From Swiss-Prot:
Transmembrane segments: none annotated. Gene3D superfamilies: Aldolase class I (3.20.20.70). GO terms for molecular function: 1-(5-phosphoribosyl)-5-[(5-phosphoribosylamino)methylideneamino]imidazole-4-carboxamide isomerase activity. It catalyses: 1-(5-phospho-beta-D-ribosyl)-5-[(5-phospho-beta-D-ribosylamino)methylideneamino]imidazole-4-carboxamide = 5-[(5-phospho-1-deoxy-D-ribulos-1-ylimino)methylamino]-1-(5-phospho-beta-D-ribosyl)imidazole-4-carboxamide. The lineage of its organism: Bacteria, Pseudomonadati, Pseudomonadota, Gammaproteobacteria, Pseudomonadales. Belongs to the HisA/HisF family. This is 1-(5-phosphoribosyl)-5-[(5-phosphoribosylamino)methylideneamino] imidazole-4-carboxamide isomerase. The keyword Transferase does not apply. Keywords: Amino-acid biosynthesis, Cytoplasm, Histidine biosynthesis, Isomerase. It comes from the Bacteria.
Length: 245
């Protein structure tokens, strides 16, 4: 299982939100490229970037920062989400050196777009499913749909999606532990690999994910915990490697 540091971008800075609320953000660095360097030097093997402005505006806003990080680390798998709602945007990021694009809102509102994106950019597409009480949220979490996460995930199995990033909104940024039972249930219900996100606080939460014994869980995204020092990236990755080894 990969430990994947998150860099959330708002107005060019690296921030963390609580429960997806733009008005409840903490700025951790005004230099996201240097922040990426910190996690790379700490031994991370993949980075998770989110264009928060893009998620709300429906198109990339912090694209220059994403490109700068991708160019600095050409051999590091990088995934980007937030405002990806056209093939042109995906093409832009892929050409910039980004390994995976995360389709969120567009995947919920226009599932056929996911299949189209997978055909155009095979192996590059991840679907981001953000949920509250099992229902999918969209538009930067501002809207809660009537769509069940597991039902939607199954729809994407035939499309060639590389992974699903599952985020529990109620947990995100709160550092109260991630929703292990639902994450494991999602991984068991779909053939698509799952990346857990939201609420990871410390090594105990990583252990809980591993102890779920769900082979479909391939990664865990962590944000506030690594910024506030309750989780060490290198230590957590070493723990995962030893557990799997």
């Amino acid at each position: 299982m990969l430990i994947i540091p998150a860099i959330d971008l708002k107005d060019g800075a690296c921030v963390r939100l609580r429960q997806g609320r733009m008005e409840d953000s903490t700025v951790f660095s005004d230099d996201p490229v240097s922040m990426a360097a910190k996690w790379v030097e700490g031994g991370c093997r993949r980075l998770h970037l989110v264009d928060l402005n893009g998620a709300f505006e429906g198109q990339p806003v912090n694209g220059e920062v994403v490109t700068a990080i991708a160019k600095r680390y050409p051999n590091l798998p990088i995934q980007i989400g937030g405002g990806i709602r056209s093939l042109e945007t995906i093409e832009h990021y892929v050409k910039a050196g980004v390994s995976y694009v995360i389709i969120g809102t567009k995947a919920v509102k226009d599932p056929a777009f996911v299949a189209e994106a997978c055909r155009a950019f095979p192996g590059k597409v991840i679907v981001g499913l953000d949920a509250k009480d099992g229902f999918v949220a969209t538009d930067g979490w501002a809207e809660i749909s009537t769509v069940q996460v597991i039902d939607l995930a199954k729809q994407f199995e035939a499309d060639g999606v590389s992974a699903i990033v599952y985020t529990d909104i109620a947990k995100d940024g709160m550092m109260q532990g991630c929703n292990v039972p639902f994450t494991a249930a999602l991984a068991a219900a779909t053939k698509i690999p799952v990346i857990a996100s939201g609420g990871i606080h410390n090594l105990g939460d990583i252990k809980s994910l591993l102890d779920a014994k769900a082979p479909g869980i391939i990664g865990a995204i962590t944000g506030r915990a690594i910024y506030e020092g309750t989780l060490d990236v290198a230590e957590a990755q070493a723990y995962c490697d030893a557990y799997n080894g």
